[in-house]
Amino acid sequence: MSMELDQSLDAIIASKPKGGIRKRRARSNKPKPTKNAKPAVNTASALKSVISEESKIIVSNLPTDVTEAQVKELFVKSIGPCKRVSLAYGPNGRSKGIATIIFSRPGDATRAYEQYEGRLVDGTRKMKVEIILDPSRQLNSLAARVSPASNASATASKNGAKSSKRKTTRRRRTPNRPKKSAEELDKEMDDYFGSNEKE
């Protein structure tokens, strides 16, 4: 350090290599490529797959003193995991005895119906279980059950419609002419030849 301080400014500059002024590269606004970029998840498709795996039932005619926790405990232990359990309440805040249960698995709603439909509660009340189906899945299943029309039948129906149209148009173009008797035809022939002889 002492030796460098003793040197003059000219000596320090002369000792450094002559490289001239270094130009800095212009920064580009392009984003740098990121490694291992994860593809974006399609939220709609993910949500649709989750919804299609659910199953839902409505249980009615329950005692009014039954709580949501009791309903959930019953179905979780006997059927399977539940996503949501809710009770319907009246304007006075009292339970109507109607519970909505959404299961995590698609087949649990059918199992709950088979196991608890018509079962007695407190020895007097009959439980009523209804399976709530997704309307979009109902439409899809109905469309799948309808068989597509074959090409042969479709072309035959089209050709039949065209031929019927042609027949109707031909019938309209040709009016019904009255048929002439043999006497009328002979008379016309005599008149024709008689006029030719006069000429």
Curated annotation (Swiss-Prot):
All residue ranges annotated as the RRM domain in the record: 55-134
Basic residues composition-biased segments: 19-35, 163-179
Region (Disordered): 1-41, 144-199
Biased composition (Polar residues): 148-161
Molecular function terms, GO-annotated: mRNA binding
Record GO biological process: mRNA transport; nuclear polyadenylation-dependent antisense transcript catabolic process; siRNA catabolic process
Compartments in which it is found: Nucleus
Pfam families reported in the protein's UniProt record: FoP_duplication, RRM_1
GO cellular component term of the entry, any: nucleus
Highest taxon, organism lineage: Eukaryota
Keywords attached to this entry: mRNA transport, Nucleus, RNA-binding, Transport
Family annotation (Gene3D superfamilies): 3.30.70.330
InterPro entries: ALYREF_mRNA_export, FoP_C, Nucleotide-bd_a/b_plait_sf, RBD_domain_sf, RRM_dom, Yra1/Mlo3_RRM
Signal peptide, first to last residue: none
Disulfide bonds, paired cysteine numbers: none
Predominant cellular place of this UniProt entry's protein: nucleus
Alphabetized PANTHER family for the sequence: RNA AND EXPORT FACTOR BINDING PROTEIN, RNA ANNEALING PROTEIN YRA1
Subunit organization: Interacts with rpn15/dss1, mex67 and uap56.
Role according to the record: Has a role in the mRNA export process. Interferes with mitotic chromosome segregation when overexpressed.
Protein name (record): mRNA export protein mlo3
Organism: Schizosaccharomyces pombe (strain 972 / ATCC 24843) (Fission yeast)
Higher taxonomy: Eukaryota, Fungi, Dikarya, Ascomycota, Taphrinomycotina
Encoding gene per record: mlo3
